[in-house]
Amino acid sequence: MFTLKKPLLLLFFLATINLSLCEQERNAEEERRDEPDERNAEVEKRFLPIVGKLLSLFGK
């Protein structure tokens, strides 16, 4: 029984590290996918008020 404990503990430890790395990579991919949408929203927030002001100036 003692001879099996060390390899099983090592296997569990390596699997835990692997799972943690996979989670970090998946989170990074999700963040990369979310960024363009957030950038578009920021651009729209900056762009629309400027267009509104320009239209109001030309409309007068």
Curated annotation (Swiss-Prot):
The modification Phenylalanine amide is found at F58. Expressed by the skin glands. It is found in: Secreted. Keywords: Amidation, Amphibian defense peptide, Antimicrobial, Cleavage on pair of basic residues, Secreted, Signal. GO terms for biological process: defense response. Residues 1-22 form the signal peptide. GO terms for cellular component: extracellular region. This is Temporin-MT5.
